[in-house]
From Swiss-Prot:
Superkingdom in the source lineage: Eukaryota
Transmembrane region(s): none
Coiled-coil blocks: 1-284
Subunit structure: Homodimer.
Keyword annotations from UniProtKB, A to Z: Coiled coil, Repeat
Region Disordered: start-end pairs: 103-131
Source species: Biomphalaria glabrata
Protein name per UniProt: Tropomyosin-2
Function of the molecule: Tropomyosin, in association with the troponin complex, plays a central role in the calcium dependent regulation of muscle contraction.
Length: 284
């Protein structure tokens, strides 16, 4: 009877130990599953962060491309403005040269007119002197008449030259007025172009600053990408290690579940044996 009681006590203690071990196994399984879930969640978060950073880098690249396009357009516009300015300067130079030539021709015509007028006056004075000295001297009179005719011809030619010079002078004055008007318009256009060039210059400075900032951001993004790439590699390595750990833990879980099942079967066997023993005792 004492032996049976000792056996029952031993079986009861073994049953309690089996229950404790089973509970410990179940807790260990829960801990392993929780660790596995945390690792999977961390891996998913790393994948999301890398995707977001990749999107930010694409956006930065698009902004850099747009800034480069604007800079090229501004440089093209500046080149066109410089070409237009050079053309206007050339036209102004040609107008100034034409004006100088017109002034030289006018000066020459004025000098010739003065010479013709002096010659006509001198001839007229000579004719009067000759007429007063000798009205009977036909030869001298004929000579004087010839000189007078020549003087008149010279005077008429001078008048024609004067009229031609006056006409050319009037045309030159009109051309000069037109040239001055074109010159004023050209100067106004040059001022306007200079203002536009200043604006374009300021825009180019802004674009250069934006380009430098974009370059700095690009360098920063490249550094960030390199860092993220390294972090991704580290995360992949950690994920790979985590997968290996999870695999090991899964194997451990399977082993613990097998042990738990064995303990449950053993517990059931002990319970059945206790029930049988109690039944035998009840029969006594």
């Amino acid at each position: 009877m004492d032996a049976i009681k000792k056996k029952m006590l031993a079986m009861k203690m073994e049953k309690e130990n089996a229950i404790d071990r089973a509970e410990q196994m179940e807790q260990k399984v829960r801990d392993v599953e929780e660790t596995k879930n945390k690792l999977e969640e961390e891996f998913n978060n790393l994948q999301k962060k890398f995707s977001n950073l990749q999107n930010d880098f694409d956006t930065a690249n698009e902004g850099l491309t747009e800034a480069q396009t604007k800079l090229e357009a501004s440089e093209k516009h500046v080149a066109e403005l410089e070409s237009d300015t050079a053309g206007l300067n050339r036209r102004i130079q040609l107008l100034e040269e034409d004006l100088e030539r017109s002034e030289e021709r006018l000066q020459s015509a004025t000098e010739k007119l003065e010479e013709a007028s002096k010659a006509a006056d001198e001839s007229e004075r000579g004719r009067k002197v000759l007429e007063s000295r000798s009205l009977a001297d036909d030869e001298r009179l004929d000579g004087l008449e010839a000189q007078l005719k020549e003087a008149k011809y010279i005077a008429e030619d001078a008048e024609r030259k004067y009229d031609e010079a006056a006409r050319k002078l009037a045309i030159t004055e009109v051309d000069l007025e037109r040239a001055e008007a074109r010159l004023e318009a050209a100067e106004a256009k040059i001022i306007e172009l200079e203002e536009e060039l200043k604006v374009v210059g300021n825009n180019m400075k802004s674009l250069e600053i934006s380009e430098q900032e974009a370059s700095q951001r690009e360098d920063s993004y490249e550094e960030t990408i390199r860092d993220l790439t390294q972090r991704l590699k580290d995360a992949e390595n950690r994920a790979t290690e985590a997968e290996r750990t999870v695999s090991k833990l899964q194997k451990e879980v399977d082993r613990l579940e097998d042990e738990l099942l064995a303990e449950k079967e053993r517990y059931k066997s002990i319970s059945d044996e206790l029930d049988s023993t109690f039944a035998e005792l009840a029969g006594y």
